[in-house]
């Protein structure tokens, strides 16, 4: 047997986030929507075996695109896709709210995504309770029946009343339960704060405004403050429990139109975060309440009312220290799309190429996961030919104290039949491991994403056709904050 001495490779691990060809650090995420069974499970009432198989198929598919993060919706309507003492299991799982499956969906997602080197961001909707009160039946144990005064109905939907402190306290406690009990990368919320306005209907929060005005005279300012307060409280809850967990928001793509605010974007959007959803995203970024923002830019490049390029540049210029990822509307791709720009995946490819030329932008999130499954080669070939050809690590959070990972130890490469078995032991703070592969005799460049072979939470990896005679394998570790350790080489036996 040939034995090589393990050598600590004292090389600077650099990121190349601005490289058009293959950035080593880049967010590549997909939303996994559970509301209305958009992505998972495909319908209520499947067997545990069927639901698990569907989840694993989704993750395998996303991993095949070299995505590195999933944003899993675990609380679409004041319900739970995890073990909760506060809210009932979602009716979109079993068909009946309060009836849980025989496994923990969030834990399975964390375990299976981790094996494939992907992080899990946990996606919650803060206020929504029922999308349609005429169709959705609440569990008898739902908070609604204990505290009906905390809720209101707008259109066909039911919501927590954002105006009450008790609402903020409860939603924050839900976040605390998740952060304490699960090893997640981030807490994530989207654009649904106050609901999108219904023409001719006023949101019925007058009683809350009268009861808890907090010295506000203007209701719109009060509403924005309600959302500010819950964002700040959620941030504080995360820090009190696990300060290394990130908090991200994916808002509607337009903060304000320039016609209303000189700081706004050159857009003519029919709704905006600030004026309609009462979500003052820029304030949250400036106050360090959130770690990243992912504006939903679901318009094409050149769209007259909300141009993707204009908005990407606007958000890049308004990051205020938070990471900025761009939300892409992959769901719009169709050969029968009304807008010709969406009749192929070229639009998504062009958007990715465009934002890679904006150094303030740190990657992408794609809506939604099922598009990677259903669109097949329509999406796969354009992305895998170039943009996502190589694996990328997720960016480090700018606002969280970085945790140092120690290099793995006892890294051994063993040939077994036609395969290679790589094994190692985790060091302190190690959450994931990055396997590199280099041709012998060439410079071992750890800054080049082309040399990343695999990422996983496991401490063992089978490598088909390892070709140990011509390749060197090495390994580093990633901490919770995605901070990379020094690498070491595998000893070949």
Regions found by a protein language model. Name each.
Residues 33-52, 122, 127-181, 275-279:
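Active-site-adjacent "subsite" loops/lids of carbohydrate-active enzymes
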Residues 53-79, 181-185, 283:
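Catalytic domains of carbohydrate-active enzymes, especially glycoside hydrolases
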Residues 63-101:
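Aromatic-lined carbohydrate-binding/catalytic grooves of carbohydrate-active enzymes
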Residues 80-94, 128-154, 191-214, 259-271:
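Aromatic- and acidic-residue-enriched segments that line the glycan-binding/catalytic groove
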Residues 166-174, 180-189, 193-267, 271-292, ...:
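Active-site neighborhood of glycoside hydrolase catalytic domains
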Residues 278-304, 320-399:
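Substrate-binding cleft of secreted/luminal carbohydrate-active enzymes
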Residues 379, 383-429, 482-493:
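Pro/Thr/Ser/Gly-rich low-complexity, intrinsically disordered linker/stalk tracts
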Residues 463-484:
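Beta-strand-rich modules
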């Amino acid at each position: 047997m040939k034995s090589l001495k393990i050598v600590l490779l004292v090389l600077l691990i650099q990121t190349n986030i601005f490289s058009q060809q293959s950035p080593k650090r880049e967010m590549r995420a997909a939303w996994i929507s559970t509301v209305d069974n958009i992505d998972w499970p495909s319908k209520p009432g499947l067997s545990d075996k069927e639901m698990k198989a569907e989840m694993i198929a989704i993750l395998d598919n996303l991993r095949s695109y070299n995505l590195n993060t999933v944003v899993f919706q675990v609380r679409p309507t004041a319900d739970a896709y995890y073990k909760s003492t506060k809210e009932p299991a979602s009716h979109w799982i079993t068909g009946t709210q309060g009836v849980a499956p025989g496994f923990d969906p969030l834990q399975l997602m964390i375990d299976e995504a981790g094996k494939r080197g992907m992080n899990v961001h946990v996606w919650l909707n803060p206020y929504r309770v029922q999308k349609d009160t005429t169709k959705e039946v609440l569990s008898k144990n739902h908070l609604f029946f204990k505290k009906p005064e905390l809720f209101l109905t707008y259109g066909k939907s039911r919501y927590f009343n954002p105006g009450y402190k008790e609402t903020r306290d409860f939603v924050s406690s839900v976040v605390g339960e998740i952060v304490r009990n699960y090893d997640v990368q981030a807490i994530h919320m989207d654009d649904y704060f106050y609901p999108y306005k219904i023409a001719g209907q006023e949101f019925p929060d007058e009683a809350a405004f009268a009861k808890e005005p907090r010295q506000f005279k203007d209701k719109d300012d009060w509403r924005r403050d309600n959302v500010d307060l819950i964002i700040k409280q959620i941030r504080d809850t995360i820090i009190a429990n696990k300060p290394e967990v990130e908090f991200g928001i994916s808002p509607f793509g337009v903060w304000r139109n320039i016609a209303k605010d000189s700081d706004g974007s050159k857009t003519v959007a029919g709704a905006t975060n600030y004026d309609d959803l009462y979500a003052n995203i820029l304030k949250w970024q400036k106050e360090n309440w959130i770690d990243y923002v992912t504006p939903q830019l679901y318009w094409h490049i050149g769209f007259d009312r909300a141009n993707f390029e204009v908005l990407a540049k606007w958000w890049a210029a308004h990051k205020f220290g938070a990471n900025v990822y761009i939300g892409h509307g992959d769901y719009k791709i169709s050969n029968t799309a009304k807008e010709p720009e969406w009749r192929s995946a070229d639009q998504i490819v062009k958007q990715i190429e465009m934002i890679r030329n904006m150094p303030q932008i740190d990657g992408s999130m794609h809506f939604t996961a099922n598009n990677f499954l259903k669109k097949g080669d329509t999406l796969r070939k354009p992305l895998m030919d170039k943009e996502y050809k190589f694996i990328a690590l997720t960016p480090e959070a700018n606002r969280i104290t970085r945790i140092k990972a120690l290099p793995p130890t006892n890294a051994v490469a063993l040939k077994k039949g036609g395969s290679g078995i790589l094994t190692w032991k985790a060091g302190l703070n190690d959450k994931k491991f990055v396997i590199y592969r280099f041709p012998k005799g060439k410079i071992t460049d750890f800054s080049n994403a082309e040399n990343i072979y695999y990422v996983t939470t496991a401490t063992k990896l089978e490598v088909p056709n390892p070709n140990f005679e011509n390749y060197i394998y090495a390994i580093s570790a990633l901490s919770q904050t995605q901070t990379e350790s020094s690498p070491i080489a595998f000893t070949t036996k």
